[in-house]
Amino acid sequence: MCKKFVYGVAVSDYNFIGRERETKRLLDNFKGGINVILMSPRRLGKTSLVKHVCNKLDDKDIITVYLDIFGCKSEYDFYNKLTAEVLKQTASKSELWFEEAKEFLYRLTPKISFSPEPNSDFSISLGITPKTHTPEEVLQMAETIAIKRKKRIVICIDEFQQIGEMANSKQIQARLRTVWQHQKHVSYCLFGSKHHLMSTIFLHRSMPFFQFGDTISLNKIATEDWVKYIVSHFADGKRTISHALAEEICKFTENYSAYVQQLAWLVFTLKEEGETVTENDVKQAKNDLLATNDILFMQMIEPLSEFQLNFLRAIIAGVTKDFGLSE
């Protein structure tokens, strides 16, 4: 049974909405070997879009590789993650990926770490260090695999802003760009959740990744698309919501994809099959949404000084000028 609304994770198929133009543009770039930089504020569905495009890509001569580097804190953390995912996701048979890895990268000493949490996946470190492998050797591996397999590879790197937060970030970026820009059989889709850091990496002329590829700015999904989606998904769940109340969900969440899905779900759970959503239901769900996010909001403002908080209060109150003037 399909979930009617999904948030907090990447969505696909039934829960994926809109993005026809962006999907076509990404597909064309992937097929054409064009590098892509995907930028937007948080919670607009970048990861969902990229995974959606990877699933739609029907070219047997193209292999897509997806990796999330949020946990990478150093240059060689990134190299280990990149290498492991490229090797695993391009292997001819998944169970043979490590045996095949020896063909493309020597001196590997894998270490497997298990999480203490039940049902958690394990992580693999290939033992890549400055003493065992140069950056160029690691970064060129995907190109070597592509040539050997007679395929093209598209590597999609989520949370790419982590590169910008590493020590010696600009030098790392320069090393990546120097190798990647000369590859003929591998292209890259780079995206992340911190818009200001992504802008610094890709939009500043002084940075190595300036004009690295097709920069796509992801905008919010239109209200009319959301309303159709919400109304139809309520109907699929044998519940009824008016266009006006569906539009109110969009207005309250300002069309941020994750929050639209979350608020719609909270409203959905208030009704049983055969029932119709009321204004009071939407009002209650709004309060539930705010309460759910209270802890997150508190964590965000805890580090702020009283002066900074007063500054924010002034903006909320509509003050837009004369900041800093004494009476």
Kindly give the residue locations of the regions a language model identified.
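A short, basic N-terminal segment
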Residues: M1-V36, P41, K111
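Hydrophobic residues on short alpha-helical segments
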Residues: L27, Q308-I316
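P-loop NTPase nucleotide-binding core
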Residues: I34-N35, M39-L44, S48-I155
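Conserved Walker B catalytic segment
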Residues: S125-K194, L203
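Short regulatory helix/loop adjacent to the ATP-binding pocket of P-loop NTPases
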Residues: H195-G213
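Conserved AAA+ ATPase "SRH/arginine-finger" region at the nucleotide-binding site
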Residues: D214-D225
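Amphipathic alpha-helical "lid/sensor" segments that cap RecA-like P-loop NTPase cores
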Residues: V227-I295
